[in-house]
Amino acid sequence: MITVFTPTYNRGALLNRLYQSLCAQRYKDFEWIIVDDGSSDDTVSIVELLQSKHRNQDFPILYYRKENGGKHTAINVGVKKAQGDLFFIADSDDILPPNALQTIVKVWEQTKDDSSIGGICGFDGDLNGGGLIGTGFPKGIHLNKLSLADNNNISYIDGTTRQIRFGLGVEGDMKEVFRTSVLREFPFPEIKGESFCPEVLIWNRVASKYKLRHINKIIYLVEYQQDGITSAITRSRMDSPIATTMTYAEMLRYDIPLKIKIKSAVNYWRFYFCLSIEKRRQNKVKIASIWYMFLFLGYIIHVLDKHKV
């Protein structure tokens, strides 16, 4: 079984569209877990209406409400509640194409016995146009083939997120579907006073132990909302500097291209100066002294952020 998980905060009006895409799935053995991160809109009544209309036909709809703490804390709750072997995060403003879960399950049936594989990863598509977002796999690389029961083949390559991103140069949005057990092994840190944690912090930690099977298929359709987390990313990072600096500090320890490390060092200092003086003294997220040469540049960008954001 798959757990489709939706964290939501004041986005109740968008849930019906996602619900309709789940009803259209060709594969039906899944549960839909919604974790409401303390919404003040009518999310509760909207979910209750969906549940009464749906009556658990095909798949159950499970709703949990918690105090506001940020998307990452909602993910932690969802992972604890999940009954599925795989955990698919579907944001309230996005949808799944009808064959998404079917494709994932068919690939997973031939993958799950390999304990080095922590999940499946496909590509995102544009909800409004349907096209691939990003570069896809570069031409000329060797892709493996999976023969599925319906006589279709799927191209794939096994590798960590960093190998695919930085080694092969794949750009754009991808959708990771993890083993639920892997996310239980790597929960998001919940830091007092912070409501944001970059997902890449955990995805990188997962990549230090597990590969993903990256398939050449669109399994997720996205539409960015003007009030969404993507458009407010700088503000979110400024307001949650401990988790943010932790993310960039860990990036500096990985085997990644130098230009990415330099960018990470600059961003570390950029958000380090969002910490209070007391928290700077207490800061346990340290980086090697070689990266101190980027302190001044990071500070300049920090000052610009304060004027723009």
How does the language model describe each region?
Residues 21, 36-46, 91:
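A conserved acidic beta->alpha catalytic loop
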Residues 99-141:
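Conserved donor NDP-sugar-binding/catalytic core segment of glycosyltransferases
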Residues 130-231:
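Conserved nucleotide-sugar donor-binding catalytic segment
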Residues 213-309:
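C-terminal subregions of glycosyltransferases and related glycan-biosynthesis enzymes
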Residues 11-24:
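Short, well-formed alpha-helical segments that are part of the catalytic scaffolds
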Residues 65-82:
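Glycine-rich, basic loop-to-helix element that forms the pyrophosphate-binding segment
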Residues 87:
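Short aromatic/hydrophobic "clamp" motif used to bind/position activated sugar donors
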Residues 29-38, 62-66:
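Short beta-strand/loop segment that forms part of the nucleotide-sugar
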